[in-house]
Amino acid sequence: MNVFRPAWLSAMLLAIFASPATLADDHMLNGMEVSQPFNVQANLCKLNPGVTLDDYHAMVEDYFDWAEKYDVEPVFVRQFPLFSHQNMQRPWPYDFVEFLASEYEPWGKSWDLWLTTEDGMALNERWQSLAVCHVKQAHGQVLYADTEALENDDERYVSWNWCTAKVGFEQLSQKHAEYVAQISENPSGLIGWALMFPHTGAADAPGDFAHLAIYPDLESFMAR
């Protein structure tokens, strides 16, 4: 499940080799242009001992105010594992993962401000006192989106499928285009489809890129 701010994003993610997005109305989601690649930051977080999610989210709310002050607001999503790969031998090391999506240059500006302004550095210190978060960067692009369905609620279910390409750019792009055409004709409960391609800090990623499928509920997920 996800906690959204402003309202949508889990599928934010990628592909330098992706076909253009197919959106129900236009190319904007929550005021962000998503028909072209954009940056996605992933924060893989474990709360420090004694810290609650409410404690942590109070800091995040202050971050939203800070980002608005400097005009560097991202689209924000928090994901919690529901059906994970963890077991006794391979426990999941994080409590949640956050995704912050933005155009590239504004996101670079936000990091400069985060590391150099007095209030940014204070928030950074507070953040690190609450949780250990491993920060990664990725390219993102939405391939298919039912904008109305994505924006009418703040909780979604997202499946991840990590992949390693066995074909070249043209073949992969063609397959994506074919699948987008099929989804557009018959979504079968799917309300969003996107890709993520890590570009910084993810040398140990489980694949070269990930497909993300977004559903409004678990009934839709199981139906596919």
Features from the language model and the residues they span:
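Short S/T/G/P-rich N-terminal loop/turn motif that feeds into the first structured element of a domain
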Residues: 13, 23-224
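Bacterial N-terminal signal peptides
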Residues: 10-18
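Bacterial N-terminal signal peptides that target proteins for export
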Residues: 1-10
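Generic extreme N-terminus detector
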Residues: 4-5, 17, 23
